[in-house]
């Protein structure tokens, strides 16, 4: 009897081993979590705006609920009102998991204790308003400030190609800020990217979000 049970156990283990031979079928260790991308809409006058997200991954949370898109009336100060429910929001929120390979060829090495000052300065340089970069910092700072160092990057096409936004009516200016970072035990040498300041004009859409890469 014991011999039969042992054989059965070994058979199960062997089957599991074979089944996990294909990375796509077992586990999601290579997935990254795109955290708290929030979308601000700033039209010149009160405007009904439809927003769709074509995401190369799985949405795990949205607010308000994403139902084949968002449809809101946006005010010049960024206040949003859901067309269907009439409820008011400050921005559109989503999170998801994908297998995006983020680019760490250029970035910044920052001591954990200096993270708040760095983010405030750099996000303002990129083009976020104080309200926007304050919300960014209070979300990410608790995850970053106790690390010895952080390797911080701001992604461009790698991110925007994996999370394509379609906004109707078409905005006049769009800023999408997505930070990917890694914790470091010690500093490394890396080239800093060139920052092109963002110019807000007409109907403006702003998004920020981020992810930690192990």
Indicate where each model-derived feature is located:
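Positively charged n-region of N-terminal signal peptides that target proteins for export
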Residues: 1-4
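C-terminal motif of bacterial Sec signal peptides marking the signal peptidase cleavage site
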Residues: 16-19
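Sec-dependent N-terminal signal peptides
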Residues: 6-12
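Protease-labile, long low-complexity intrinsically disordered regions enriched in Pro/Ser/Thr
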Residues: 23-214
């Amino acid at each position: 009897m014991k011999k039969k049970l042992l054989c059965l156990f070994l058979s199960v283990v062997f089957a599991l081993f074979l089944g996990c031979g294909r990375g796509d079928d077992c586990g999601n260790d290579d997935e990254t979590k795109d955290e708290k991308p929030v979308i601000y809409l700033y039209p010149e006058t009160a405007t009904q705006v439809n927003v769709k997200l074509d995401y190369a991954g799985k949405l795990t949370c949205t607010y308000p609920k994403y139902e084949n898109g968002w449809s809101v009336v946006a005010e010049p100060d960024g206040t949003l009102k859901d067309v269907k429910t009439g409820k008011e929001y400050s921005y559109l929120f989503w999170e998801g998991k994908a297998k995006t390979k983020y680019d760490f060829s250029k970035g910044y090495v920052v001591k954990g204790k200096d993270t708040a000052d760095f983010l405030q300065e750099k996000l303002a340089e990129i083009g976020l308003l104080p309200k926007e970069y304050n919300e960014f910092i209070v979300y990410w700072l608790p995850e970053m400030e106790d690390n010895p160092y952080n390797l911080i990057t701001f992604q461009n096409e790698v991110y925007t190609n994996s999370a394509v936004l379609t906004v109707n009516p078409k905005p006049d200016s769009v800023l999408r800020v997505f930070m990917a970072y890694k914790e470091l035990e010690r500093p490394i040498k890396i080239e800093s990217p060139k920052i092109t300041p963002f110019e807000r004009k007409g109907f403006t859409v702003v998004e920020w979000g981020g992810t930690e890469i192990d």
